[in-house]
Amino acid sequence: MSGRGKGGKGLGKGGAKRHRKILRDNIQGITKPAIRRLARRGGVKRISAMIYEETRGVLKTFLEGVIRDAVTYTEHAKRKTVTSLDVVYALKRQGRTLYGFGG
């Protein structure tokens, strides 16, 4: 199995390992106006100031679960790229079926 990278599939020597930037506190990227727009779409007229942090926390918890399941599907298929179908299946597993993305 010489001449193949870490994965064992494909040809080539496999490039140098890149350093991954440590991501922290990216949940603050979900801005106050973005949360406000989502609430407006849901029919909310007025929003309490404490809602924003609470919404970020709930969203982070929800996405962690979906991403964990999607990555599990990806690893089981021995792939390194998470596909839209992985996310669809992860959502379906959690009882939130999503239509329009195949599967």
Swiss-Prot record:
InterPro entries the record matches? CENP-T/H4_C, Histone-fold, Histone_H4, Histone_H4_CS, TAF_TATA-bd_Histone-like_dom
> Where mainly found?
nucleus
UniProt-recorded Gene Ontology molecular function terms:
DNA binding; protein heterodimerization activity; structural constituent of chromatin
Q: Which residues carry this modification: N6-glutaryllysine?
A: 92
Processing after translation? Glutarylation at Lys-92 (H4K91glu) destabilizes nucleosomes by promoting dissociation of the H2A-H2B dimers from nucleosomes.
Sites bearing N6-acetyl-N6-methyllysine, chain numbering: 6, 13
Q: Write out the ranges of the annotated region (Disordered).
A: 1-20
Task: Cite the record's note on assembly.
Answer: The nucleosome is a histone octamer containing two molecules each of H2A, H2B, H3 and H4 assembled in one H3-H4 heterotetramer and two H2A-H2B heterodimers. The octamer wraps approximately 147 bp of DNA.
Q: Which family does it belong to?
A: Belongs to the histone H4 family.
Q: Please give the name of this protein.
A: Histone H4.1
Species source reads Emericella nidulans (strain FGSC A4 / ATCC 38163 / CBS 112.46 / NRRL 194 / M139)
